[in-house]
Amino acid sequence: MANKVKIGILNLMHDKLDTQSHFIKVLPNADLTFFYPRMHYQNRPIPPEVNMTSEPLDINRVSEFDGFIITGAPIDQIDFSKITYIEEIRYLLQALDNHKIQQLYFCWGAMAALNYFYGIKKKILAEKIFGVFPHLITEPHPLLSGLSQGFMAPHARYAEMDKKQIMQDERLAINAVDDNSHLFMVSAKDNPERNFIFSHIEYGKDSLRDEYNREINAHPERHYKKPINYSMSNPSFQWQDTQKIFFNNWLKKVKDNKLVLN
């Protein structure tokens, strides 16, 4: 695997095995190492599926990787200060920054990183952004190369970062939004290795259905709206091209950066 780029992934998602499978599929030509936050399991046993497929996060290993991903997490309605492992996340963010590793942050991971690096505030939404939506490219970026206006991508979150704050920060660019102006991608002009993605473009075609079913099974007393522009009975992989193009672009960015550093 010497010729492969090495990617570390901090997997914070609810379905650890599904998430791992998704990233293995979208990054087939990379050497992937999955991690879990140590502080999350300080006072409770580590689930077997986590222990078997992931390693405890070791900040000292960050420099081994050419790229690093922090996934989403089902905690976007919780204040950052209340997250039991937030300090561990911040140590990781600082280490990634120190070593200038290519960074890709998804959903909650993007929220935590934007808050840490730029002080951007998180806002809880009146209702969940949930479904598959067309998108507008507002500022071109290499990671969006090959995507056309109207490209499709899935969203599933209860919070949004403060767009006004982002727009007022000259270090940041909003590169794409959905048709309701919800964030898809924010990039850092001051540190081009940082990229923040608010869509779950790693999802497979059944993932939105699985997420909906998981929520209603966990809380049958609550009302959950079904995903928009998405058939629960016959899901369509409308974002497959988006997924392939985006991750190919990011892998190219990681490889190019590795060549420069070497």
UniProtKB/Swiss-Prot annotation:
One record GO biological process: cysteine biosynthetic process from serine
Q: Name one Pfam family in it.
A: HTS
Site: Important for substrate specificity. Where?
A156
Residues at the site labelled Important for acyl-CoA specificity: D76
The catalysed reaction is:
L-serine + acetyl-CoA = O-acetyl-L-serine + CoA; L-homoserine + acetyl-CoA = O-acetyl-L-homoserine + CoA
This protein's pathway: Amino-acid biosynthesis; L-cysteine biosynthesis; L-cysteine from L-serine: step 1/2
Which residues catalyse the reaction? C107, H200, E202
Q: Which residues bind substrate?
A: K128, R214
Q: Which UniProt keywords apply?
A: Acyltransferase, Amino-acid biosynthesis, Cysteine biosynthesis, Cytoplasm, Transferase
Origin: domain of life: Bacteria
* Annotated family: Belongs to the MetA family.
Free-text function comment from the UniProt entry: Transfers an acetyl group from acetyl-CoA to L-serine, forming acetyl-L-serine. In vitro, also has homoserine acetyl transferase activity.
The protein in question is named Serine O-acetyltransferase
Native species of this protein?
Lactobacillus acidophilus
Give me the gene this protein comes from.
metA
